[in-house]
Structure formats: C-alpha cells, structure tokens
C-alpha cells in the first residue's frame, strides 16, 4: 500500500518547453487510463523533478527541453554496491566463471554511506573508488556529491571544502601547483589557501574519470615536502596526493571504468570500492518523465519500451536509456510511428545515427567524425580543438549539424569540442576500424594493426570490457553490417570483417578465462554461428573448488558466474544457451534436497535484489532454449506473478526445458493451478521437483488434474508426502498405476513404520520391501545409499562434516521442540536414541549449534571481529542454542544473522541506567520479516527468588529514531518471550528502584583460564553474570595472552550484583586480588578477575569462593594436572613434511592483519633479526594494530624465505592459538619453516 505523502509544498521545479503544460498540474491531462494513477502518484510525490543540462558536462538530456541548473536530482536512485575489501588489491574481482562458489560480493548502500564504515574493515575510508560499466552514471554521481554538499544535503559535517576535477580537462594542463589545482576545483574561491590547507582532514578531492588520460600517477617524491605554491607536472601532483606524501589526511573520491588502478596509480592505498549498477526499476520509468517535457509523450514512450523486456533491460544503463529516449523523440518529431526493435546497444546507436544525421553528411563527414573519434580513443583524448576537427576534414556546416543534433558538445570554458558521451565516441571509433579495414588497402596487416592498437589501448585482460570492442562485435554481426551498409550506402566485405573478429578472439582468449565481457561481445554480435563456435571452445577442465565438498565427483562440471544486474543476467542467459557443455541453468546455489547434480550446469549468483523485471528477462530468453534442458530456481522465493511468467514460457513452443527444480520456493496451493496448466499443455517438461513447499491437499489435487491429461509428458514428480492426507496419497498411487511411466517420489515416507531394533541390514531392507508391497507402494522408489542409516522412515542421509578427518553427522532426529527448554530438548534426543537402539551413534553437535527438529544446525561465523554469526534454519520448528541461550520459533526455512553487541554503545546515550537494570545480553538480530513467530531472549534473573514482578521485565529496542521499551508476551525462567517480533539491537532490562539494584538475585558463572609457561601455571578466575556476550569477550581477551579455559560447574546458589566474595584455595597459592565483586560490566569493558599463581602443578588444587559477609561457600572446584590440556598439537612435523607451498605468512596475510592483536611483542622478537631500528620504529609509529601489520607486510616484500621463517617462529611464540587456528582451517599444513 502506498503511504500518503505529507501535505507540503513541493520545491521541485519543472521543465517547460514551447508552451507545454506544467508537469505539476493534472487538470489538462489526457493520458492512457493504465498510467493515469501511476502518473498522478508520481506528481504528488514530487518524483518528476526538473532536469537541466550544464555546458561541458556528460548529461544525457536534450538541451532544448531542459534548463541549465540543478543536475542533482537526475540520478538519486542509482543502485550502488559496496564491495568487500579485495584480498589482493592488484587483482580486483574479475567477472569470470569459475568452479568454486564465489564469496558474497558486498551489499547495497545509499549515496550517504559512501564514506561510512567499510563492511570489510569497519573503518571510514579515506579513498572511495566509484567503478562501473561505460555510461552507467559514475560522472553524474560524482557531480551529485559535489552539488549535494554545496547545498548542505550531504557530508556537510564531514568536509569543509569539496573540489571537483574532470580528469579529461585536468590532463590538458602540463604543470600546476597545489594552490592552482585547488583553485581549479572550485567554482568560486571560498577561502584563502592557507586556511583551506590548515585542516586537510576536512578536504575532499573528487577526480572524475581517473583512468581516462594516458598517465601514470606515481608518487615521485614520497619523502619530499613541497610548498603549495610550487608547480610540478599534473600527473606527479596527483600521484603525490594519492600516495599520501601531500595532504595525507585528505579524502578522495575517484570514478573509473576499470578496477585495475594499480597499473597507473602504483602508490594507491587500499580503497573502498563501490560499483554503480545502473537504474533501479522505478528510476527507469522516472527517467522518461524527466526526459520528455510532454507527459503524454513520456507515457507513450515508456509503454512502448515496457512492452519489450530486452529494451527495458537495456535501459538499466543510463546512457542507453538516453539513447532510447532520443530515438523515440526523433521519431515523434518526424511524425513516425514509434518503433524500436533493437536488441543491442550497437543496434540502438545505428538507429540513433539514422535518425539524427542528415543524408548529406553520412558519407564523408561522418567518416571524418569517426576518424576523429578513433584518434582520440587511441591517444586517450576526449577534448578536441578546432584544428583537430579541420585536420580530419570536418567543415563548419557539418560541425554545426553535429552540435545541433547533440552528437558533439562545445565546452563553455574553452574552444574545445567533445562527443556527447565517451561511449558515443567509442562507437564512432569502432565504425572507423571497420571502414578502414574494409578498404582492403593492407589486408591482414591492417587487421593486425587494428587489433594491436586495441590491445595497447585497453590491455589483453580488459579487451572484452572495452565498449569499442563490444561495438566492433556488434557492427560486424549480420544486422550490424546491414545497418552500416544502409547508413553509409556502401558494401562491406563480410569475410574480411569476420576475419577481424577472429583476430580479436585469437589475440585475447589465451590470456583470460571466459568472462562476462566476452559474453557481452557475443551478445552484441547476435550471430548464431559465431556464438555456437566460440561457446563450444570454452569447455576447458573445471577443478572442484574448496566449497564443493558434498559432491566432489559429481560437481566437477558445475560452473559459477556472478551477475549483479538485469543486463548481465540477460547477456549470460542468452549466451549460455549456445554453450553445449551446460545442460542446466541455476539461479543462486541452494543445497539440493534429495537429488544429485548430475547434469552439467551453470550457477548464476546475484547479491542484488531479483525483481519482477529480472525474472521477465530471464524467462524471455528461455523461450528458445537450444542446448539448455534444465532450470533450477530452488531457494528463491517466487511471487505468484513470477510463476505465472515462468509457466507462460514453459508453454511457449520454442521452450525445450525438460527438468524444472522449484525446491523451497514458497509455493502454496494457489500456484498449483499454474503448474497444472503447464502439465496439461504440450510442454516438453518431464521432471518436476517441488519439495519443501506447502502445496497442501488442494494444490496436489490440481497437479493430479494436469497429470491425468493425455498430453502430459511428466515422468518424475518429487513431492513432500508427509503433510498430505491418506486420500490424496491414494489418488497419487492410482495415477502411478494407470501411468506406468510416471514415478512420484518423496523425501519423507512417514507411513512406513519398521521396528529396526536388533535387526541387521538385510532384515531391515527385506522388511521395508515387504511393507511397501503390502501397502501398494511399489511404484514409489525409496532413494537411499549404502552410506545412509536405514530406520523407521526409510533411509536417513549421512552428512559429511570433515572429509579429511572422516567425520560424519546424522541429523535426522525428529523431536517436537516447541515450548521446550534446552535441558528438555537434549533429554528428548537422548531418550529417542536410547529407544531406537542408537546408543553407539553419537549426535555430533556443539553448544554453538541451534538444536531443532532435525538435530543440530551449525552456526556460521560471518565476521569474527564483529562477533557476527549466521544460522540457516532449514525448516519450520523451534530452535535453541545452548551457548547463547537464544531460542527461535520459525514458520519456514529462514536465515538469521546474530551479532553480539555491547550495552555501553547504546545505554550511554539514554537515561535508562537510572531506572532500569541490564539483565541479559544485547543482540542485533536480522531475519526475514514474518519468518520468526517467537524469539526467546535470555536473562539472568532468578525468578523463583526475586520479588520483582514479571511486568517489570522489558525488551529494549535501539532503533534509528531512539530507544523503545517493549513488554514481552511471557517471562519464564531464563527467558523473555516476544511473539511476532521486529528486530533491531535488543536485550532484556528490568525496571527497578535504584536502591533495590543490589537485591536482585541473578544466575552467574565462573570462568577459569590457565597458561603454562616453563612448567609454571597461572590461573585467571572470573565471577560474572550468565551473559554469553561477556563470556565471549573474556574468551577473546584471554586468548590474546594464550590462556585456555577450563570448564567447571557454575555456582549453585543465586548471587547478587554488588556483593563481594572471597577467593581462596589450597596452600602455596598466590591469589591477587583475594576479593572479587560481582558486577555487570558491558562486554566492551574490562572484566574483574583474580590471578592465581600456582607454580609447578604436580598435584591437584582446590579453589573456593565464599560470600564475604556471611563466609558461606558458594562455589568450589578441584583442578587436577590432567585438566591442563597439551598446549598445541603437532605442528612442527606437519611443516617438515609439507611440500613446497605458499609461505604461511603470505598464505594468511588477510587473517594476520585482522587478528594479530598484540604487535609490539612480535616486533620485539623480530628486532635485530629481521627489522633494523628504522623499520622497527616505522612499524611502531602506526596508530592501530592492523596498520602496524600492514606496514610490516609492506616491508616483507623484500624478505627472503629465511626472514619469513623467523617471522613465523616469532608468531608461534607470541600468538600460538592464532597459528593453530589458521593451520587447522587450512588443512593443518602451511609452510612456515
């Protein structure tokens, strides 16, 4: 439902054109009925702002219909993806397919978050790189930042001065001083240079198009401090700024097409990367309203585009959206019927030329324009003087025409000219290559020269990413050649042009893997023969990735590709159909249920939202499937309209899909009528997988109607039969009997009850077969293997936990856990195992797992430093985690993220501490809305002994607008229960009278840690409230100093906050301090403990804690020498046996930078051996431990292997647990010495 906008006067100005009506009035509208409500809504919300053009800027709107101010509102809804920090800055993420599952690429952000904490480092970046494809809106976004700052809407508190530079213009200057550079970056002087430079941390430099000029921005004088008035070459000045030898505290925003910035900015520090992905769905539509001054024209144009999924997808790129609008506007002006059948950007450009360039200029003047464009591309020039134009043979009349039609622009600040957009210049350059080559003056030599020029300009690795190369592929396709011949009234030599394509492919393919760039080129070409031939050559041998442990043999033919946008999705799905080595297309990898991935498949990953438009273009491309036989959409939540579009595609005559997976897609009985319509049609579908969907009896009956149709070709149907009634199951069996080719299979077979106690394997199998025959279940096959556990419900799959250790898990223990406490759940599991005779079989789970209907579900560490965890609950039910004491009741499969928070981060900003007492941990929980019906938040108040009312318990929510106190639905021992919760940082507090704080009984825990140093034992003893975030903080702190926890029972009695306790023990123990206060301190604060020096622990010792006031014993523990586990497992021998691998230091660089928490002891051990005095002090001078480690690794580039071995030995001595953890995660072997 749309929210009603606030009644306020809009400050949005509106463009007017030649007496056209004002867009803010609706009195005289005469538009199509379909779009009237939508347009009126946009007008009320102020979503149709004015758009202006500023001379000399890459703004893609016709000058005659727009004013010359306020560019800011044009691209406010560009999709921005903040990437995770690259592991190797010199080899940024390439969009090529691989055999392993890719790591998640980042998350979507708003423009306000560009200089917010980075998702990888949690630091505010000094350098932000805006990257993206050609024409995606990077430059406009950069100008938006400058304008929004100037108007006080963005970063006003962060920066005092913001300077904007177009690098294409900056490259025209030979030498500049810092003062001249700053003056050039301001529209008007704002302050004296001395005042500006006095606060460099408040300066932002925006460098637009940093990769356009042919320069290398090296820091030539890193040690030289230059005066701001001293002039030097521009590239040197910029290199010094980016290299931090000048104004090291300043901030930078760079825009670039390429991610390989290290090539021409060698001193570039680690940036925050943000990729511009183009327009969101609503912004595509809004653009039409911005472009056309006449609202009816806007509606008509967008309706035409919206009816064509390919054209709508192409409009995701702002530059292409401008191209489409311009073509439609020209057709309107010329009185033509609106028609755009273009399927590619190249075809749109040819259409644009045919509509805008008069016939008299096409033969000679357009060729001259193409030569000008090509010369500029090869020399990295985008600005041209009048003499440049004359040199290419462009006359005044032609230049005036090109300016009038918008092909060329004249710069207001100079006498220079430029193309309306860099992409347009690259398109003309591509035409120039073909026209020159087609003259056949030099034959193959000319082709070699063109290809070598392309390689020199873009590099082999980025050749297919270059728009010029993509345009070449498009122009040399059959439709492209026809368009050029018609445009230039000439005949092009097809064979010669085809040779040029093969030259490009041969030159580049050996140097790069199959990537999205190549697919883009092939898509532009659209030639079926070329697509088939090239895609056939891409087979290669795929090696299983590190995450492919479950099906190592079967998944060697699985390839993975990340597609972030609808454009990439369209290109990938179009080309993959010609790839004969892929039989199945899968969108977003989901762990499969009950079937093996046998067919060769391509898995497409997408971290950005999948919209209706995304599904539309996917299904549009699948109407002609060619080599594809299977489609797997498992794990994607599908709306009804999406399934409707899918079924329309499946019924299309050209669609030859045979297998469809819709496992866990949120389907209900309502969807079954759509699927039944496919079964009743002459579709090619033979296998359908519908497990883990709530279809119900009614839905399955609809499917049965489709299955009864004589034209139905389905032979295999997978369903969950456990929730179906006996009547429907009988109906399915009857269908199988009547149709011998039909097999209906199920994961669960609950009606099969076999007493398996004291039966051997043969007896179990025999009994199962007999029972199936007796129940008439013969057609239904029980899918199981020799590795499964066969029991009352048939085969139970054994899950591989660790292949190297031969560790397996049997998770299928069915326990109703609703309203059960931790102890009840564990007891129920034990009882069930005893009753089933499963005593020898251990359920492999830990206290960190969530225990639910099918046993333990592992918790995944997302970000260790932030204490951020993720658990994927596989089905509806109740789940409890013993270590955190969190408890969720969920209605369906859901992924939940849990972050441990510190109360001090939030409470310091509120008066809550005076009236309320913290009585539980603080969690930041994220889950899909509606999936969690109840959450049990732990508290440590003893209800049986407290006089506090359960009405005094509150759940504190910390939200953007402030804090909210919510009354829980229920309070029970150890938990408060919220039903249908909304999530934010949340935890339990208790309303109190301040004087009563020390009379609240709480449950507490004791934590004991030990460290053995040369056979002398030191213990640390803590007494703290039962709060998992505090325990985790203590664990982490003790681990820094190589202390290991010993598990001992907690105090039996309830204790009181503020009470004091005496620590004592056996004779000859040195205890400091001997008195402990039980207090609640936030997990970020220092926790109180007693240090106990034992000496040589040859025999057992006793520890006791007594209440100081009454000297009552509240806790006692006996420590034996056997409680002290060996410090480290075998490492040395593993290292001796290791082959020649990457050194431990290099292999674990990222983890060491993030996790070495005490650098100075490490430096002390390296001092004099590896580090000289200067290097030692240089590392110590860094502010943070992470910066110190980065500096140390920077110095290590010149180290020999022997020096790295010394580093490894020092690290083992100072951080043995970290070394151990890294070795275990890497398989136990990493060459260090």
From Swiss-Prot:
Record-annotated FIIND domain positions: 850-1133
Chain ranges of the NACHT domain: 126-435
CDD domains in the cross-refs: CARD_ASC_NALP1
Impact reported for residue 702 to A: No effect on IL1B release under basal conditions, nor in response to LT or metabolic inhibitors
EC number: 3.4.-.-
Reported effect, residue 744 to A: Spontaneous IL1B release under basal conditions, loss of response to metabolic inhibitors and to LT
Activity regulation summary: Activated by cleavage by B.anthracis lethal toxin (LT) endopeptidase: cleavage by LT promotes ubiquitination and degradation of the N-terminal part, releasing the cleaved C-terminal part of the protein (NACHT, LRR and PYD domains-containing protein 1b, C-terminus), which polymerizes and forms the Nlrp1b inflammasome. Activated by S.flexneri IpaH7.8, an E3 ubiquitin ligase that mediates ubiquitination and degradation of the N-terminal part, releasing the cleaved C-terminal part of the protein, which polymerizes and forms the Nlrp1b inflammasome.
Annotated consequence of substituting residue 663 to A: Spontaneous IL1B release under basal conditions, loss of response to metabolic inhibitors, no effect on the response to LT
Effect of mutating residue 996 to D: Strong decrease of IL1B release, but no effect on autocatalytic cleavage within the FIIND region
Keyword Repeat in annotation: yes
Stretches for region ZU5: 850-983
Assigned GO CC terms: cytoplasm; membrane; NLRP1 inflammasome complex
Localization per record: Cytoplasm; Cytoplasm, Cytosol; Membrane
Effect of residue 705 to A: No effect on IL1B release under basal conditions, nor in response to LT or metabolic inhibitors
Subunit organization: Interacts with DPP9; leading to inhibit activation of the inflammasome. DPP9 acts via formation of a ternary complex, composed of a DPP9 homodimer, one full-length Nlrp1b protein, and one cleaved C-terminus of Nlrp1b (NACHT, LRR and PYD domains-containing protein 1b, C-terminus). Interacts with DPP8; leading to inhibit activation of the inflammasome, probably via formation of a ternary complex with DPP8. Interacts (via LRR repeats) with BCL2 and BCL2L1 (via the loop between motifs BH4 and BH3). Interacts with NOD2; this interaction may increase IL1B release.
Name of the protein in its database record: NACHT, LRR and PYD domains-containing protein 1b allele 1
Classification of source organism: Eukaryota, Metazoa, Chordata, Craniata, Vertebrata
Gene: Nlrp1b
